[in-house]
Amino acid sequence: VNYNTRFYPLNQHARQMVADGELGDIRLISGHYMQDWLLFDTDWNWRLEPDKGGSLRAVGDIGTHWIDLTSYITGLKVTSVMAELSTFVKTRQQPVGPVETFSQAGSGETIAREITTDDTALLLLRYENGARGSVVISQVSPGRKNAMQWQIDGSTSGASWDSETPDHLWIGHRD
């Protein structure tokens, strides 16, 4: 898997800030990764089928990118996870015949299919240094095409980045 957001310039800069101790000891890592491409019951992709894409759809498809990025920036590994997985679109219309990702559903024939993979996930994380984290992952958030955001809070400063404004890095200080 190509975790390409690691290489955005401001994510590289944030990683260097953490390595240089500019945030202090990392205490809290939070954020989200939201998309809308599977919002409707007529949206279909092979990732919906557990035998093809695995049982963890939203977590496996996009959540791993957020966890990789924040672990890369902080240098911290996740040691435990508590997850709340939800499937809101429990039945989808699978087109008969080939399907192209992100294409509009045609007026062709469909088959109703039960969905067991996750549309959303709420994850609580523990990191090896004792830091805590939380992330919301969704593939059913209207208007969010590919919105990844992280906030990293240390003992002296915090930093935040959002993929929808990738040329901005927020840095916060108490004073």
Please describe what each predicted stretch is:
Residues 106, 111-175:
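NAD(P)-dinucleotide binding in Rossmann-like oxidoreductases
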